[in-house]
Amino acid sequence: MGNGQIIKDAHAKINLGLDVLRKREDGYHEVKMIMQTIGLHDTLTFKRTEDEEIVIESDSGKLPLDEHNLIYKAAKVFFEEIGQAFGVHVFLEKRIPIAAGMAGGSTDAAATFEALNELAGFPCSQEKLMEIAVRVGADVPYCIMKGTALSEGIGEILTALPPVAPANLVIAKPDIDVSTAFVYKNLKVNELDSHPDIDGMRAAIEKNDLQGVTERLGNVLETVTIPAHPIIGQIKACCMANGAVNALMSGSGPTVFAIFDSPVKAEQAAEKIRSEFQLHEVYVTEFWGQ
């Protein structure tokens, strides 16, 4: 049995490419996406306790810390799987923007599965953790896998890809809330003028061709979210006007990420975005592999 304390970094993710192929009869959308973890992360400290309680504390005042938190849900699923023998106290340092389309909750859940597995003496393989993690959320298995991956089906079919070549990123989250359900409900799959070249992007990743990746950035959900929230398009345009190689909305939004060919350009653009749009959640980071 493991014991003591474990500290885990839980990394955010962005979608380099997001395509929706069709709406299935069960109401879910069939997707084809390239997912990528980035340097921006939350930090979680786990302490094993013997009272079989799940206790969560955080430096963020914006999150539920009860059974509605994905950390709690992940702990519950893990303890059910192994037959609970201990409890856990979790402290979450929140750095990933909340409700931003960056899997902030899912990555915290993934870190919880990994830490509890370690504290329990590794009863589950990574494959097993990914299998049970889907009970907590569709993005959680990917957040356990990390790195660069192709995601298909309704997001549950994952294929690991080689790491993307290093790049400097600016992440900017406007101060608005976007409902993922609203975006998918209003997406007109049959009326899309164009689809991102996910296969071409995968080929570029496999050739370590960063330019080929950046010029193929695409997200069909922009067709819904940007008309509803024009500031997203304005932030993208500001990134491009300030030296970005390309820029895209991540997931269902509202976060925008932009790729730069130097850290200096990224820092300058971040400063410009902060001042022009009065944004607090603007970060300079990079692609992050395992």
Q: Model segments located where?
A:
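ATP-binding N-lobe of GHMP and related small-molecule kinases
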Residues: 2-100, 118, 122-127, 154, ...
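Residue-level signal for inorganic ion chemistry
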Residues: 16, 44-46, 71, 105, ...
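Hydrophobic C-terminal alpha-helix "anchor/cap" residues
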Residues: 35-38, 133, 239, 273
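Conserved, helical-rich catalytic subdomain that frames metal- and/or nucleotide-binding sites
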Residues: 145, 150-246, 261-264, 270-274, ...
